[in-house]
């Protein structure tokens, strides 16, 4: 089922590896002309425009953008107790990890009386997008909300698409997760129009704009984020989900097959890639996938994803080459199924998250490992990171020099002012001291 790319007997460069690897992705540029008028209309007409587009695209128009408090409360009250227990346990685990991510203020003394202090200031108001589509994602509510709360974000709003089968409001499980987390502002709006409304708000409708937008979504959500970036901050662009498994002959073929299938379940564009130095394992995994995918509830979606050009098996000479390949692929999720898996994992530099050993599968990270599941895709893990408490914090420097400390470094500043032909900079220093030479004399 999975196509095979054979890199054995080669010494490929980074460029060669990137060209050879199966890779999906979405062409965001192609939908920008569709999304831009939506964003501009929502900027001009606010909530009414957002509701109009929801009715046009999704054939549903909620009674209001903001979900009433009683609807949110009812969703929590009717939540399945087992689902509630799982949500609460995942919140506990994710909160424990993200609470420890918060950095501490620190001060550096450059000279007596001259200090620079770095403080970490939370974003004031954040919009968290939770998609609808093929599945219900209360886990995304957790993964976006908890790090923002741990960072100290003052105001949170969740936006999620309205559902016709639920009275035009977001899915009750989404609303229940919001309620459990203490998020009482939820907007029943999805797609690019949700991103635009979060960015620009609507004063007349009582919808305050945000300072940052995070959360995964489809290509239209991604395009809208690109269009409003600069008006607000955004997290990294999220393409279709992906898993890479780096495995040797010691790997359990059944478990590897299940992990590849589980990621393919998300989306027909999802990528599932096995990187291995064992031809026998490759054959075994392909056989196990063929035997097992059809019994999953989402078999048709899984089959299309696994047969797509974005999925496949990559054969390499040895695990050291496999590490190079994995680094160039820079997977959203990377599983290590090798001997000495931790030692291999420590050699990886590019991945959204690394899952070490047979008992650390990606589905654990999707829900309750404690790590975050909002991760960079499409190779962007080479230069970006997943969602964390850091995402919602801004480092701000406080520069504090007394007279002696400034005088000690004043000539350095004046010399730079001369070199850059910005004499007023030097004069701003000299004016504070009587005996310093003028900028021209320095």
Curated annotation (Swiss-Prot):
Cofactor mode of binding and number, as noted: Binds 1 zinc ion per subunit.
Keywords on record: Amino-acid biosynthesis, Histidine biosynthesis, Metal-binding, NAD, Oxidoreductase, Zinc
Binding-site residues, NAD(+): 129, 193, 218
Region (Disordered): 1-20
Keyword Iron-sulfur set for record: no
Involved pathway(s): Amino-acid biosynthesis; L-histidine biosynthesis; L-histidine from 5-phospho-alpha-D-ribose 1-diphosphate: step 9/9
UniProt record, GO biological process: L-histidine biosynthetic process
PROSITE patterns documented for this protein: HISOL_DEHYDROGENASE
Cofactor: Zn(2+)
EC main group: oxidoreductase
Binding-site positions, substrate: 241, 263, 266, 333, 366, 420, 425
Active-site residue numbers: 332 (proton acceptor), 333 (proton acceptor)
Gene3D superfamilies, A to Z: 1.20.5.1300, Nitrogenase molybdenum iron protein domain
GO cellular component: cytosol
Gene Ontology molecular functions: histidinol dehydrogenase activity; NAD binding; zinc ion binding
Reaction catalyzed: L-histidinol + 2 NAD(+) + H2O = L-histidine + 2 NADH + 3 H(+)
Coiled coil (residue ranges): none
EC numbers for this chain: 1.1.1.23
PANTHER family: HISTIDINE BIOSYNTHESIS TRIFUNCTIONAL PROTEIN, HISTIDINOL DEHYDROGENASE HDH
Family: Belongs to the histidinol dehydrogenase family.
Reported function: Catalyzes the sequential NAD-dependent oxidations of L-histidinol to L-histidinaldehyde and then to L-histidine.
NCBIfam families cross-referenced by the UniProt entry: hisD
UniProt-recorded name of the protein: Histidinol dehydrogenase
Origin species: Corynebacterium glutamicum (strain ATCC 13032 / DSM 20300 / JCM 1318 / BCRC 11384 / CCUG 27702 / LMG 3730 / NBRC 12168 / NCIMB 10025 / NRRL B-2784 / 534)
Record gene name: hisD
